[in-house]
From Swiss-Prot:
Cofactor note: Binds 1 pyruvoyl group covalently per subunit.
Positions where Pyruvic acid (Ser) occurs in the chain: 180
Organism for this UniProt entry: Carboxydothermus hydrogenoformans (strain ATCC BAA-161 / DSM 6008 / Z-2901)
Site (described: Cleavage (non-hydrolytic)): 179-180
HAMAP family linked: PS_decarb_PSD_A
InterPro entries attached to this UniProt entry: PS_Dcarbxylase, PSD-A
Active site: 180 (schiff-base intermediate with substrate)
Gene expressing this chain: psd
Lineage: Bacteria, Bacillati, Bacillota, Clostridia, Thermoanaerobacterales
Cofactor: pyruvate
UniProt name for this protein: Phosphatidylserine decarboxylase proenzyme
Amino acid sequence: MKEPLVMYREGFWYLVALGVLTVLGALINFWLGLLVFLLFLFVVFFFRNPRRTIPEDEKAIISPADGVVLDVAEVNESYYLKGPAVKISIFLSIFDVHVNRAPVEGQVEYVYYREGKFLPAFKSHASEINERNYIGIKNPYLQVLVVQITGFIARRIVSFVKPGDILKKGQLLGMIKFGSCTEIYLPKETVEVLVQKGQRVYGGITVIGRIKG
């Protein structure tokens, strides 16, 4: 089944509202209508879902999101992996593609939504206290945890998966509306990390790690 090029379902009410405002604005003043129409086009742009060619290497772990790597750090992950892990934090600006993708194939084993604050996503402590959604995926090689985190502008997390779902690598997990951060936790002893702080990555394309062995 082909994915839509624009996530119309998730952006439906934004597009309807702006479509109506475009017509009303044009009736009042041409330039006002044009301004609202440009905003309408930006929202279409924001909800875009470009086609991605997923790497076939079964040991490759791909980025779950587009954006810039904010940090790569060794941590102790306590929600799902429950042990030593490498955390890769990816910041998404409002101009990035905002869908999240499965970094590996496997079964969704864990989903947990935690309420919190809405601090700017680039703040270091935002990842600890902002609202977020945890998605744990398991396959015969490893367990991976993806965390969708809200930001100051991004206040709506959409998840497409539930426990028990079987995912293909690169399959859509969900999206975060209007700027955000996505984190991925990889088991430290199992994975070789291939990205570094400041690097731009692309969801479904960039190989951020490889399973050892």
